[in-house]
């Protein structure tokens, strides 16, 4: 979810597989990625700073990214991936789960791959909690107060 611009992203494993996006109210639904770039998209991650959408493809065994509108698709990691299940991002790094390991690499180049955890017990998902991962926007209360002020004036 990209709350600041009110967009929702999701994967569809249908035939053909695709990554889609829509407004939070369901309107303006668009297919962003389909065809040769996609087989089994298992997880998505949004990089708020570079405005990129990352995904793992379990069949193609790659991690790719694109601009938030689906343009400029690029492979970031395409070697050594066996059974990926989750991806997340923080600062200049991406982190992903593959089999029972958690990996880290440069999110721009895919280089400097490091194993952070070698024998995790059945990891399924991966999250990083940090204030930088929570983009600041107008709070609902602020919008509500501004609406009241506008109505009263």
Residue spans of the language-model regions?
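Hydrophobic core register within WD40 beta-propeller blades
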Residues: 1, 44-46, 86-87, 126-127
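Beta-rich catalytic cores
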Residues: 4, 15, 40, 59, ...
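Short coil/turn segments that connect the beta-strands within blades of beta-propeller domains
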Residues: 4-6, 49-51, 91-92, 131
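Surface loop/turn motifs at the tips and blade-to-blade linkers of beta-strand repeat domains
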Residues: 32-37, 76-80, 116-120
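Blade-level signature of beta-propeller repeat domains, shared across WD40, Kelch, NHL, RCC1
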Residues: 90-93, 97-148
